[in-house]
A protein has these predicted regions:
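TOPRIM fold recognition
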Residues: 1-9, 147-151, 162-255
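Cysteine protease catalytic domains with a Cys-His-Asp triad
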Residues: 65-71, 98, 107
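Short amphipathic beta-strand/extended segments with alternating polar/hydrophobic composition
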Residues: 45-47, 109-114, 230-231
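N-terminal structured subdomain of primase-like DNA metabolism proteins
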Residues: 1-66, 72-93
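Phosphate-handling DNA/RNA-contact segment within nucleic-acid enzymes
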Residues: 91-192
């Protein structure tokens, strides 16, 4: 029996209409299209990360700005500007949401500190995402879209620091790698042709700094970019600061 005949016999068209779908045969394949384009049952906006999802949780006031605001380094206007540029969001409980949006403006995932990811929730809610291969990019990568190739890029560990530093040093594009387990040599591939500086956290043993020296060597062997690892904290942080594993923003706030 031909597939067209099977389709008619099984009354799949009628079944489809009953659940809001138009069922058609196209080039030998079944094609199901929502009868109502606005039918939320078949909207992918709430299955995979989307700019609609990003927009629905947007916010512009965050507690992590308070040290910089209290020190007079930032104004509330700058806080709102940074929150808008980085598409920051908030959970219902008030925790900041840091979206990973690539250089094609595709939201890939979102990080909710300290160690929770939106992709985990989506997989729990939607069985269809069981085999979803989640990709990550640098936080702030979307800022390349409207930047010149000559604009320097700086990379820190956490998103809060990148957002605040972007207002302190606006001539630089600030990004974050979020955590070392997410680092791979291809993470920096979209930055080819640019001058990039990594600002590692310091620690008493210099292990983090040495790790990034090795990482930078691997990246340079694979991708064409002018990559440096900043040693400011290794040279100028106190023993106490190194024991606390401060980052470059902590150093600025404490200076």
């Amino acid at each position: 029996m031909k597939l067209e005949e099977l389709l008619a016999k099984a009354s799949l068209k009628g079944i489809g209409r009953g659940i809001g779908l138009d069922v058609q045969m196209v080039d030998g394949y079944l094609q199901c299209t929502p009868l109502d384009p606005d039918d939320s049952r078949y909207s992918t906006d709430f299955i995979l990360p989307s700019m609609k999802m990003v927009g629905d949780c947007r916010a512009n006031d965050f507690d992590f700005f308070q040290p910089a605001l209290a020190a007079g380094l930032l104004t509330e206007e700058q806080m709102h500007h940074a929150a808008e540029r980085y598409h920051l969001g908030k959970t219902k409980s008030g925790r900041p949401i840091f979206w990973l949006i690539d250089d094609m403006l595709n939201p890939l995932d979102a990080h909710i500190a300290p160690d929770f990811w939106i992709s985990t929730t989506l997989r729990t809610r939607e069985p269809l995402l069981e085999y979803w291969q989640v990709r990550h990019c640098l936080f702030g990568l979307h800022l390349l879209t409207n930047s010149k190739l000559s604009a320097p890029v700086a990379i820190v560990e956490n998103e809060q620091s990148a957002v605040i530093l972007s207002e302190l040093f606006p001539e630089t594009i600030w990004m974050a790698y979020v955590s070392i387990p997410h680092l791979n040599t291809n993470l920096l591939a979209p930055l080819q042709g640019r001058t990039v500086t990594i600002y590692p956290r310091t620690d008493y043993t210099k292990s983090n700094y040495l790790f990034f020296l090795d990482y930078a060597n691997h990246v340079r062997s694979l991708h064409s970019l002018n990559l440096h690892v900043d040693a400011t904290l290794e040279h100028h942080a106190t023993d106490s600061q190194k024991s606390s594993c401060i980052d470059i923003l902590d150093f600025i706030l404490q200076s």
